Protein backbone atom coordinates (compact mmCIF):
# COMPACT_ATOMS: atom_id res chain seq x y z
CA UNK A 1 0.00 0.00 0.00
CA UNK A 2 1.43 3.40 -0.99
CA UNK A 3 2.66 5.48 1.91
CA UNK A 4 1.84 2.67 4.33
CA UNK A 5 4.75 2.80 6.74
CA UNK A 6 5.67 0.12 9.22
CA UNK A 7 4.40 2.42 11.96
CA UNK A 8 1.01 2.71 10.18
CA UNK A 9 0.86 -1.08 10.22
CA UNK A 10 1.65 -1.16 13.95
CA UNK A 11 -1.13 1.35 14.61
CA UNK A 12 -3.59 -0.73 12.60
CA UNK A 13 -2.59 -3.82 14.57
CA UNK A 14 -3.12 -1.88 17.80
CA UNK A 15 -6.63 -0.82 16.71
CA UNK A 16 -7.44 -4.39 15.67
CA UNK A 17 -6.31 -5.59 19.09
CA UNK A 18 -8.64 -3.18 20.87
CA UNK A 19 -11.53 -4.09 18.53
CA UNK A 20 -10.90 -7.80 19.07
CA UNK A 21 -11.10 -7.37 22.83
CA UNK A 22 -14.58 -5.81 22.44
CA UNK A 23 -15.96 -8.65 20.28
CA UNK A 24 -17.19 -11.78 21.98
CA UNK A 25 -16.03 -15.05 20.51
CA UNK A 26 -18.57 -17.48 19.18
CA UNK A 27 -17.37 -20.76 20.54
CA UNK A 28 -20.51 -22.76 19.76
CA UNK A 29 -19.64 -23.17 16.05
CA UNK A 30 -21.78 -25.48 13.94
CA UNK A 31 -21.47 -28.38 16.27
CA UNK A 32 -24.74 -30.29 16.89
CA UNK A 33 -26.06 -30.06 20.48
CA UNK A 34 -25.57 -33.78 20.92
CA UNK A 35 -21.81 -33.45 20.61
CA UNK A 36 -19.85 -32.07 23.54
CA UNK A 37 -17.53 -29.15 22.92
CA UNK A 38 -13.93 -29.68 23.83
CA UNK A 39 -11.39 -27.10 25.02
CA UNK A 40 -9.61 -27.72 21.72
CA UNK A 41 -12.79 -26.60 19.89
CA UNK A 42 -12.83 -23.38 21.89
CA UNK A 43 -9.16 -22.77 21.18
CA UNK A 44 -9.68 -23.38 17.45
CA UNK A 45 -12.68 -21.03 17.42
CA UNK A 46 -10.69 -18.23 19.07
CA UNK A 47 -7.87 -18.62 16.54
CA UNK A 48 -10.31 -18.78 13.60
CA UNK A 49 -12.11 -15.64 14.82
CA UNK A 50 -8.78 -13.76 15.00
CA UNK A 51 -9.29 -13.22 18.71
CA UNK A 52 -6.48 -13.42 21.23
CA UNK A 53 -5.58 -16.40 23.37
CA UNK A 54 -5.00 -15.11 26.90
CA UNK A 55 -2.99 -16.71 29.73
CA UNK A 56 -6.18 -17.94 31.47
CA UNK A 57 -7.34 -19.81 28.32
CA UNK A 58 -6.70 -23.46 27.64
CA UNK A 59 -4.11 -23.95 24.91
CA UNK A 60 -2.46 -27.03 23.37
CA UNK A 61 0.87 -27.92 24.97
CA UNK A 62 2.66 -27.57 21.63
CA UNK A 63 1.26 -24.03 21.18
CA UNK A 64 2.49 -23.11 24.66
CA UNK A 65 5.93 -24.67 24.00
CA UNK A 66 6.29 -22.89 20.66
CA UNK A 67 5.47 -19.54 22.23
CA UNK A 68 7.86 -20.09 25.12
CA UNK A 69 10.62 -21.00 22.66
CA UNK A 70 10.04 -18.04 20.37
CA UNK A 71 9.36 -15.39 23.02
CA UNK A 72 12.30 -16.52 25.16
CA UNK A 73 14.61 -16.56 22.14
CA UNK A 74 13.41 -13.09 21.32
CA UNK A 75 13.95 -11.86 24.91
CA UNK A 76 17.45 -13.37 25.03
CA UNK A 77 18.22 -11.67 21.70
CA UNK A 78 17.34 -8.27 23.10
CA UNK A 79 19.56 -8.80 26.15
CA UNK A 80 22.54 -10.32 24.29
CA UNK A 81 21.93 -7.70 21.58
CA UNK A 82 22.97 -5.01 24.05
CA UNK A 83 26.57 -6.24 23.89
CA UNK A 84 27.68 -5.32 20.35
CA UNK A 85 26.39 -1.78 20.79
CA UNK A 86 27.47 -1.50 24.43
CA UNK A 87 30.97 -1.89 23.03
CA UNK A 88 30.66 1.65 21.57
CA UNK A 89 28.98 3.59 24.39
CA UNK A 90 32.29 4.80 25.80
CA UNK A 91 33.67 5.51 22.31
CA UNK A 92 30.76 7.33 20.68
CA UNK A 93 32.07 10.34 18.72
CA UNK A 94 30.13 12.99 20.68
CA UNK A 95 28.19 13.45 23.90
CA UNK A 96 24.94 13.60 21.92
CA UNK A 97 25.71 10.34 20.09
CA UNK A 98 26.63 8.74 23.39
CA UNK A 99 23.36 9.81 25.05
CA UNK A 100 21.33 8.47 22.11
CA UNK A 101 23.19 5.15 22.09
CA UNK A 102 22.78 4.78 25.86
CA UNK A 103 19.04 5.34 25.51
CA UNK A 104 18.83 2.81 22.69
CA UNK A 105 20.68 0.12 24.62
CA UNK A 106 18.44 0.79 27.62
CA UNK A 107 15.39 0.37 25.37
CA UNK A 108 16.74 -3.07 24.43
CA UNK A 109 16.94 -4.04 28.10
CA UNK A 110 13.33 -2.86 28.40
CA UNK A 111 12.28 -4.97 25.41
CA UNK A 112 13.93 -7.99 27.00
CA UNK A 113 11.94 -7.36 30.17
CA UNK A 114 8.56 -6.99 28.39
CA UNK A 115 9.30 -10.24 26.57
CA UNK A 116 10.40 -12.18 29.65
CA UNK A 117 7.21 -10.95 31.33
CA UNK A 118 5.15 -12.16 28.33
CA UNK A 119 6.89 -15.57 28.52
CA UNK A 120 6.17 -15.76 32.25
CA UNK A 121 2.42 -15.58 31.54
CA UNK A 122 2.88 -19.03 29.93
CA UNK A 123 3.88 -20.52 33.27
CA UNK A 124 7.66 -20.45 33.15
CA UNK A 125 9.93 -18.42 35.42
CA UNK A 126 12.46 -15.89 34.18
CA UNK A 127 15.20 -17.62 36.21
CA UNK A 128 14.50 -20.83 34.34
CA UNK A 129 14.62 -19.08 30.96
CA UNK A 130 17.89 -17.34 31.76
CA UNK A 131 19.37 -20.65 32.97
CA UNK A 132 18.36 -22.27 29.67
CA UNK A 133 20.11 -19.52 27.72
CA UNK A 134 23.28 -19.80 29.79
CA UNK A 135 23.33 -23.58 29.49
CA UNK A 136 22.90 -23.33 25.71
CA UNK A 137 19.44 -24.95 25.79
CA UNK A 138 17.77 -21.89 24.27
CA UNK A 139 18.96 -19.72 21.42
CA UNK A 140 19.31 -16.04 20.67
CA UNK A 141 19.49 -14.34 17.28
CA UNK A 142 22.46 -15.23 15.09
CA UNK A 143 23.04 -11.56 14.29
CA UNK A 144 24.52 -10.73 17.68
CA UNK A 145 27.45 -13.06 17.10
CA UNK A 146 29.13 -10.60 14.74
CA UNK A 147 31.60 -7.99 16.00
CA UNK A 148 31.20 -4.19 15.92
CA UNK A 149 34.52 -3.03 14.50
CA UNK A 150 33.93 0.69 13.86
CA UNK A 151 31.48 3.46 14.81
CA UNK A 152 29.76 2.97 11.44
CA UNK A 153 28.72 -0.50 12.66
CA UNK A 154 26.40 1.25 15.13
CA UNK A 155 24.74 2.96 12.16
CA UNK A 156 24.56 -0.32 10.23
CA UNK A 157 23.04 -2.14 13.21
CA UNK A 158 20.39 0.55 13.59
CA UNK A 159 19.56 0.71 9.92
CA UNK A 160 19.85 -2.96 8.95
CA UNK A 161 19.47 -5.01 12.15
CA UNK A 162 16.70 -2.90 13.66
CA UNK A 163 15.23 -2.61 10.17
CA UNK A 164 15.15 -6.41 9.82
CA UNK A 165 13.85 -6.74 13.37
CA UNK A 166 10.94 -4.40 12.71
CA UNK A 167 10.01 -6.03 9.37
CA UNK A 168 9.92 -9.37 11.20
CA UNK A 169 8.14 -8.00 14.27
CA UNK A 170 5.36 -5.82 12.83
CA UNK A 171 3.39 -8.97 11.87
CA UNK A 172 3.96 -10.28 15.40
CA UNK A 173 1.81 -7.36 16.65
CA UNK A 174 -1.05 -9.50 15.25
CA UNK A 175 0.15 -12.69 16.95
CA UNK A 176 -2.68 -14.82 18.34
CA UNK A 177 -1.23 -14.78 21.87
CA UNK A 178 -2.39 -11.56 23.55
CA UNK A 179 0.56 -10.77 25.86
CA UNK A 180 3.09 -11.25 23.03
CA UNK A 181 1.05 -9.15 20.58
CA UNK A 182 0.73 -6.32 23.11
CA UNK A 183 4.44 -6.39 23.95
CA UNK A 184 5.28 -6.28 20.24
CA UNK A 185 3.24 -3.14 19.63
CA UNK A 186 5.24 -1.22 22.18
CA UNK A 187 8.53 -2.71 21.00
CA UNK A 188 7.89 -1.94 17.32
CA UNK A 189 7.22 1.73 18.04
CA UNK A 190 10.61 1.96 19.71
CA UNK A 191 12.40 -0.12 17.07
CA UNK A 192 11.20 2.30 14.44
CA UNK A 193 13.05 5.11 16.22
CA UNK A 194 16.11 2.86 16.49
CA UNK A 195 16.11 2.24 12.77
CA UNK A 196 15.94 5.96 12.03
CA UNK A 197 18.83 6.76 14.33
CA UNK A 198 20.96 4.13 12.55
CA UNK A 199 20.02 5.55 9.18
CA UNK A 200 20.94 9.04 10.40
CA UNK A 201 24.38 7.89 11.60
CA UNK A 202 25.08 6.29 8.21
CA UNK A 203 23.72 9.30 6.34
CA UNK A 204 26.05 11.60 8.26
CA UNK A 205 29.04 9.35 7.57
CA UNK A 206 28.22 8.74 3.92
CA UNK A 207 28.02 12.50 3.36
CA UNK A 208 31.19 13.19 5.36
CA UNK A 209 34.87 12.79 4.45
CA UNK A 210 35.95 10.05 2.00
CA UNK A 211 37.28 8.10 4.99
CA UNK A 212 33.92 8.31 6.78
CA UNK A 213 32.10 7.29 3.61
CA UNK A 214 34.37 4.23 3.23
CA UNK A 215 33.78 3.32 6.84
CA UNK A 216 29.99 3.46 6.30
CA UNK A 217 30.25 1.34 3.15
CA UNK A 218 32.48 -1.20 4.88
CA UNK A 219 29.97 -1.56 7.74
CA UNK A 220 27.07 -2.07 5.32
CA UNK A 221 29.14 -4.65 3.41
CA UNK A 222 29.71 -6.65 6.60
CA UNK A 223 26.19 -6.38 8.10
CA UNK A 224 24.06 -6.92 4.97
CA UNK A 225 24.18 -10.72 4.76
CA UNK A 226 24.00 -11.41 8.52
CA UNK A 227 20.90 -9.16 8.53
CA UNK A 228 19.30 -11.14 5.69
CA UNK A 229 20.07 -14.34 7.62
CA UNK A 230 18.22 -13.04 10.71
CA UNK A 231 14.93 -14.02 9.05
CA UNK A 232 15.86 -17.66 9.51
CA UNK A 233 16.30 -20.63 7.15
CA UNK A 234 14.46 -20.71 3.81
CA UNK A 235 10.81 -21.75 4.16
CA UNK A 236 11.59 -25.19 2.77
CA UNK A 237 13.96 -25.82 5.72
CA UNK A 238 11.97 -24.00 8.40
CA UNK A 239 10.89 -26.45 11.09
CA UNK A 240 8.21 -24.32 12.72
CA UNK A 241 6.80 -21.90 10.14
CA UNK A 242 3.88 -23.95 8.87
CA UNK A 243 2.46 -24.80 12.29
CA UNK A 244 3.22 -21.34 13.70
CA UNK A 245 1.35 -19.75 10.80
CA UNK A 246 -1.62 -22.10 11.28
CA UNK A 247 -1.76 -20.97 14.92
CA UNK A 248 -1.51 -17.29 13.99
CA UNK A 249 1.81 -16.89 15.84
CA UNK A 250 3.78 -16.14 12.69
CA UNK A 251 1.86 -14.40 9.92
CA UNK A 252 4.37 -14.78 7.09
CA UNK A 253 7.11 -17.19 6.13
CA UNK A 254 10.80 -16.36 6.56
CA UNK A 255 11.40 -15.89 2.80
CA UNK A 256 8.50 -13.50 2.38
CA UNK A 257 9.75 -11.26 5.19
CA UNK A 258 13.32 -11.41 3.87
CA UNK A 259 12.05 -10.22 0.49
CA UNK A 260 10.10 -7.35 2.08
CA UNK A 261 13.26 -6.28 3.88
CA UNK A 262 15.29 -6.22 0.64
CA UNK A 263 12.53 -4.23 -1.10
CA UNK A 264 12.56 -1.73 1.76
CA UNK A 265 16.35 -1.35 1.90
CA UNK A 266 17.19 -0.81 -1.78
CA UNK A 267 15.63 2.68 -2.10
CA UNK A 268 16.95 3.64 1.34
CA UNK A 269 20.49 2.64 0.29
CA UNK A 270 20.12 4.96 -2.70
CA UNK A 271 19.26 7.85 -0.38
CA UNK A 272 22.30 6.99 1.72
CA UNK A 273 24.48 6.91 -1.39
CA UNK A 274 25.76 3.46 -0.37
CA UNK A 275 25.66 0.20 -2.30
CA UNK A 276 24.37 -3.13 -1.07
CA UNK A 277 27.05 -5.81 -1.52
CA UNK A 278 25.17 -8.03 -3.96
CA UNK A 279 26.04 -8.19 -7.66
CA UNK A 280 22.83 -10.13 -8.25
CA UNK A 281 20.60 -7.35 -6.92
CA UNK A 282 18.26 -6.06 -9.64
CA UNK A 283 14.66 -5.03 -10.15
CA UNK A 284 12.55 -7.96 -11.32
CA UNK A 285 9.67 -6.35 -13.21
CA UNK A 286 7.83 -9.67 -13.63
CA UNK A 287 7.64 -10.21 -9.90
CA UNK A 288 7.45 -6.51 -9.03
CA UNK A 289 10.16 -7.09 -6.44
CA UNK A 290 13.95 -7.06 -6.25
CA UNK A 291 15.85 -10.20 -7.15
CA UNK A 292 18.76 -10.77 -4.76
CA UNK A 293 21.38 -13.34 -3.78
CA UNK A 294 20.29 -15.14 -0.61
CA UNK A 295 22.54 -15.34 2.44
CA UNK A 296 24.82 -18.30 3.04
CA UNK A 297 22.51 -20.57 5.01
CA UNK A 298 25.37 -22.92 5.94
CA UNK A 299 27.00 -19.99 7.70
CA UNK A 300 23.68 -19.27 9.48
CA UNK A 301 23.51 -22.90 10.63
CA UNK A 302 27.08 -22.70 11.95
CA UNK A 303 26.40 -19.48 13.84
CA UNK A 304 23.18 -20.91 15.32
CA UNK A 305 25.14 -24.00 16.42
CA UNK A 306 27.51 -21.76 18.38
CA UNK A 307 30.33 -21.35 15.88
CA UNK A 308 30.01 -17.71 14.86
CA UNK A 309 32.75 -15.10 15.34
CA UNK A 310 31.57 -13.99 18.81
CA UNK A 311 29.30 -16.75 20.22
CA UNK A 312 31.65 -17.76 23.00
CA UNK A 313 32.45 -14.19 23.96
CA UNK A 314 28.75 -13.20 24.10
CA UNK A 315 27.74 -16.09 26.35
CA UNK A 316 30.80 -15.73 28.58
CA UNK A 317 29.99 -12.05 29.05
CA UNK A 318 26.33 -12.84 29.83
CA UNK A 319 27.37 -15.50 32.37
CA UNK A 320 29.74 -13.06 34.05
CA UNK A 321 27.03 -10.38 34.22
CA UNK A 322 24.62 -12.93 35.72
CA UNK A 323 27.14 -13.92 38.41
CA UNK A 324 28.16 -10.36 39.18
CA UNK A 325 24.51 -9.29 39.45
CA UNK A 326 23.57 -12.05 41.91
CA UNK A 327 23.98 -9.78 44.94
CA UNK A 328 21.69 -7.16 43.37
CA UNK A 329 18.93 -9.72 42.82
CA UNK A 330 19.35 -11.04 46.37
CA UNK A 331 19.26 -7.50 47.81
CA UNK A 332 16.16 -6.62 45.78
CA UNK A 333 14.40 -9.80 46.93
CA UNK A 334 15.35 -9.12 50.58
CA UNK A 335 14.13 -5.54 50.28
CA UNK A 336 10.81 -6.63 48.73
CA UNK A 337 10.34 -9.25 51.47
CA UNK A 338 11.08 -6.70 54.19
CA UNK A 339 8.52 -4.29 52.76
CA UNK A 340 5.87 -6.99 52.61
CA UNK A 341 6.73 -8.22 56.10
CA UNK A 342 7.88 -11.70 55.00
CA UNK A 343 11.22 -13.43 54.55
CA UNK A 344 13.01 -13.62 51.19
N1 LIG B 1 19.11 -16.95 14.88
O1 LIG B 1 11.65 -23.06 11.94
P1 LIG B 1 12.38 -21.78 11.99
C1 LIG B 1 16.38 -7.63 17.55
C2 LIG B 1 16.33 -21.23 14.57
S1 LIG B 1 15.54 -8.95 18.09
C3 LIG B 1 19.09 -18.00 15.71
O2 LIG B 1 12.20 -20.86 10.82
P2 LIG B 1 10.92 -19.96 13.72
C4 LIG B 1 16.23 -6.32 18.28
C5 LIG B 1 14.91 -21.38 15.15
O3 LIG B 1 14.84 -20.91 16.48
C6 LIG B 1 16.06 -10.29 17.01
N2 LIG B 1 18.27 -19.06 15.53
O4 LIG B 1 12.05 -21.03 13.37
C7 LIG B 1 17.55 -5.68 18.41
C8 LIG B 1 14.71 -22.86 15.04
O5 LIG B 1 15.46 -23.52 16.04
P3 LIG B 1 14.83 -24.59 17.11
C9 LIG B 1 15.37 -11.51 17.37
C10 LIG B 1 17.44 -19.02 14.48
O6 LIG B 1 10.98 -19.73 15.16
C11 LIG B 1 18.10 -4.97 17.38
C12 LIG B 1 15.43 -23.21 13.73
O7 LIG B 1 16.39 -22.18 13.53
N3 LIG B 1 14.03 -11.51 16.86
O8 LIG B 1 17.06 -7.80 16.61
C13 LIG B 1 17.41 -17.94 13.59
O9 LIG B 1 9.61 -20.37 13.14
C14 LIG B 1 19.35 -4.36 17.51
C15 LIG B 1 14.48 -23.33 12.56
O10 LIG B 1 13.93 -22.05 12.17
C16 LIG B 1 13.17 -12.48 17.18
O11 LIG B 1 13.47 -13.37 17.93
C17 LIG B 1 18.30 -16.88 13.82
N4 LIG B 1 18.34 -15.80 13.02
O12 LIG B 1 11.40 -18.66 12.93
C18 LIG B 1 18.24 -5.77 19.62
C19 LIG B 1 11.78 -12.32 16.58
N5 LIG B 1 16.49 -18.20 12.63
O13 LIG B 1 14.22 -23.76 18.17
C20 LIG B 1 19.49 -5.18 19.76
C21 LIG B 1 10.85 -13.42 16.97
C22 LIG B 1 15.97 -19.40 12.91
O14 LIG B 1 13.85 -25.42 16.37
C23 LIG B 1 20.04 -4.46 18.70
N6 LIG B 1 11.21 -14.68 16.37
N7 LIG B 1 16.55 -19.90 14.01
O15 LIG B 1 16.00 -25.37 17.62
C24 LIG B 1 10.82 -15.05 15.12
O16 LIG B 1 10.16 -14.31 14.41
C25 LIG B 1 11.16 -16.45 14.68
O17 LIG B 1 11.55 -17.19 15.82
C26 LIG B 1 12.30 -16.51 13.61
C27 LIG B 1 12.59 -17.99 13.30
C28 LIG B 1 11.81 -15.86 12.32
C29 LIG B 1 13.57 -15.84 14.09
Predicted features by range, described:
Residues 22-40, 104-132, 199-202:
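Conserved alpha-helical segments that form or flank metal/cofactor-binding pockets of metalloenzymes
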Residues 2-21, 214-344:
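Extended, helix-rich structural scaffolds rather than catalytic motifs
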Residues 175-226:
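Glycine- and acidic-residue-rich phosphate-binding/metal-coordinating active-site segment common to enzymes
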Residues 52-72, 132-158, 175, 208-212, ...:
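Acidic/His metal-coordination segments adjacent to aromatic residues that form catalytic metal sites
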Residues 1-63, 95, 326-344:
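Extreme N-terminal leader/anchor segments
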Residues 63-74, 92-111, 154, 179-191, ...:
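Alpha-helical scaffold segments that form or flank carboxylate-/histidine-based iron centers
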Residues 57-63, 81-103, 165-180:
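Helix-loop segments that flank and shape redox-cofactor active sites
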Amino acid sequence: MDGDTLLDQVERAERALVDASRRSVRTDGDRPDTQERTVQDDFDAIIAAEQKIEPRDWMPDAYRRTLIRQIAQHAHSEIIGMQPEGNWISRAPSLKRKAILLAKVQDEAGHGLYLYAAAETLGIGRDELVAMLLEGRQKYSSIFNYPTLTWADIGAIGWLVDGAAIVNQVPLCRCSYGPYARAMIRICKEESFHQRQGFEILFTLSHGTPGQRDMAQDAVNRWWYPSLAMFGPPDADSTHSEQSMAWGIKRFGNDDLRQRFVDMCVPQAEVLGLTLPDDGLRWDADRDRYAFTPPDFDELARVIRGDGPCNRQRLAHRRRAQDEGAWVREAAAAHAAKRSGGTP
